[in-house]
């Protein structure tokens, strides 16, 4: 009976840790999206992974890339978190974002855990699903 209790306890703790990761990942993405809406690129930069920060060098370059390459992130209206999928020590978080014109976009955020918490390690715009038949 002790073994069953121990296994149950481990399962509960693992589920709790997973829920905390889910919430932390959503918080990082939401915070960065809010920072972009406020045009606070310095704050948005803090949610980028060390690899992304090395790639762009400074918040200004990073902000210009987002403004020009990800307009639905630069000015976003509504965010809905979809599935979260583990991937080789990282997490892929799909997010439905509506841009300023109300057009929906599905983005996939690659999340990496750092000593400072979860950070965004890349974003891909997924193709829109086909409608009709």
Feature-to-residue mapping (PLM):
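Residue-level detector of flexible, active-site-proximal loop/helix-junction positions
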Residues: 10, 51, 127
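Sec/Tat signal peptide C-region and signal peptidase I cleavage site
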Residues: 13-19
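Short solvent-exposed beta->alpha transition segments
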Residues: 23-27, 31, 41-88
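Exposed beta-sheet edge and beta->alpha loop/turn motif
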Residues: 83-133
């Amino acid at each position: 009976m002790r073994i069953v209790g121990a296994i149950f306890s481990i399962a509960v703790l693992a589920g709790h840790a997973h829920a905390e990761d889910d919430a932390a990942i959503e918080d990082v993405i939401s915070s960065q999206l809010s920072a972009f809406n406020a045009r606070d690129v310095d704050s948005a930069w803090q949610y980028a992974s060390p690899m992304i920060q090395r790639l762009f060098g400074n918040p200004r370059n990073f902000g210009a890339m987002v403004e020009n390459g990800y307009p639905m992130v630069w000015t976003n209206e509504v965010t809905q978190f979809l599935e979260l999928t583990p991937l080789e020590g990282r997490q892929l978080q799909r997010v439905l974002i509506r841009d300023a014109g109300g057009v929906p976009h599905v983005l996939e955020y690659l999340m990496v855990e750092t000593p400072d918490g979860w950070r965004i390690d890349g974003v891909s715009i997924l193709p829109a699903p086909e409608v009709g038949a």
